[in-house]
Structures are given as structure tokens and as C-alpha cells.
UniProtKB/Swiss-Prot annotation:
Belongs to the iron-sulfur dependent L-serine dehydratase family. Heterodimer of an alpha chain and a beta chain. It comes from Bacillus subtilis (strain 168). Its cofactor is [4Fe-4S] cluster. It catalyses: L-serine = pyruvate + NH4(+). This is Probable L-serine dehydratase, beta chain. Pfam families: ACT, SDH_beta. GO terms for molecular function: 4 iron, 4 sulfur cluster binding; L-serine ammonia-lyase activity; metal ion binding. Keywords: 4Fe-4S, Gluconeogenesis, Iron, Iron-sulfur, Lyase, Metal-binding.
Length: 220
């Protein structure tokens, strides 16, 4: 899911008329799928701003569903993603919201099954680039351009240092890191973008640290 050099300007190869409305939308959906870790049974997509005005004509709805099915931006199946999802028995609902977003190309995705639910807000900033701005009520800034680790934890002294020590042990270089929390001493979310894909055994070691609740990753 990484794009470099000229692709950062003109956008990746994509199915659809606009890199912001299709490639970016597909990547938002794919990040949600990656974090959820499995195919959802129910999908609710809420469109804001420009997305709300043009999502049907520009294929934004199709692109997001394609991403949620784990299709890449150049996958021809994106064109029929909604039909494919419905054939799988996935329940899909699109909503147009009146609220004025900070960025015009904004979508909120809620996906769920009998095991759980995930809510994610993403923006498409042009050229196929995206930012994830909210995850399950936590504010964050996640580009989707690099492998990332997301750590849900209790806001306790030494937790961040413990995670950093594990990453240093395996020579994992951190490109960007931030922490959001509900309140002092409550649930927190650590977002860590790194320079290489993370093996599962590293995630296992992170998950065994004190105060860690859940560890997930986004692969490159």
C-alpha cells in the first residue's frame, strides 16, 4: 500500500475517474479491513462533504466496498465490489451526512460481525493518499503509506517505554509515533508507523507486556 515518487503526485493506477474519490476511498476501506482482520458481515459507510455530493457518480461507494473486500486499487473486481459483497451476504448501508467535515473527502466506516465492531474515519487528500483521523473514538493521524502497529493499552507509567524497548530489541525503526487517550489513566491508543513489516512474533511479544490490551498491524 505504499506509493513513491511520481505516484505521490499523479496517484496510483486505479479503477475509476478520480484518485481522491476512488483510489483514496479504496485505500480507506482496505485499511479498515486490515485493522478488522477479517471480512465483515455488516458495513455502514457515512459520506461527508464532497464525498456525500458525488459518491455515486464517482464510484466512491464501490471503491470503499472494494477496499473492505481487500481489493487493491488496480483490481478490476472493484467495479462490481458491491455485487460481490451482497452475493457473500454482507449487509451494506450508505448514509449521506449533513455535518460539515474538516476535509471535504471524508468517510466514516463502521464494520461489524458477531465477534466485534470497528469504526474508522478517513480522508482522501489527493493522489491516492489518505489519512485515518479517528479509530474507535480515538483521534489519530495514520497515513497508510507505511507499515504500522496500533496498540490499545491502559494509560499507565512505563507502557510506552516497554513498547519502545521491544521495537528496539528487534531493530525496528520508528518513522512516526503518537498516543491518544480517553482520559488520564484510562484507555489509550498508540499509533506507530515503522520502516519495515512487523513479524507476528514481535506482535506476540508486545501483547504480553503489562497494560497492553490489543495489538494489531497494517502491513505494507
Amino acid at each position: 500500500m505504499k506509493y513513491r515518487s511520481v505516484f505521490d503526485i499523479i496517484g496510483p493506477v486505479m479503477i475509476g475517474p478520480s484518485s481522491s474519490h476512488t483510489a483514496g476511498a479504496a485505500r480507506i476501506g482496505r485499511v479498515a479491513r486490515s485493522l478488522f482482520g477479517r471480512e465483515p458481515e455488516r458495513i455502514i459507510v457515512s459520506f461527508y462533504g464532497s464525498f456525500a455530493e458525488t459518491y455515486k457518480g464517482h464510484g466512491t461507494d464501490v471503491a470503499i466496498i472494494g477496499g473492505l473486500l481487500d481489493f487493491d486499487t488496480f483490481d478490476e473486481r472493484i467495479k462490481t465490489a458491491i455485487q460481490i459483497a451482497e452475493a457473500k451476504g454482507i449487509d451494506i448501508e450508505f448514509r449521506v451526512e449533513d455535518a460539515v467535515p474538516v476535509h471535504p473527502n471524508t468517510a466514516k466506516i463502521t464494520i461489524s460481525d458477531e465477534k466485534g465492531e470497528l469504526e474508522l474515519t478517513g480522508i482522501s487528500i489527493g493522489g491516492g493518499k489518505i489519512e485515518i483521523t479517528e479509530l474507535n473514538g480515538f483521534e489519530l493521524r495514520l497515513s497508510g503509506n507505511h507499515p504500522a502497529i496500533l496498540v490499545v493499552h491502559n494509560d499507565k507509567f512505563g507502557t510506552i517505554a516497554g513498547v519502545a524497548n521491544v521495537l528496539a530489541k528487534f531493530s525496528i525503526n520508528v518513522g512516526h509515533m503518537e498516543v491518544a487517550r480517553k482520559d488520564i489513566g484510562q484507555l489509550a491508543l498508540m499509533t506507530i508507523e515503522v520502516d519495515q513489516n512487523i513479524d507476528d512474533h514481535i506482535l506476540d511479544e508486545l501483547s504480553k507486556l503489562p497494560n497492553i490490551i490489543q495489538v494489531t498491524k497494517i502491513a505494507d
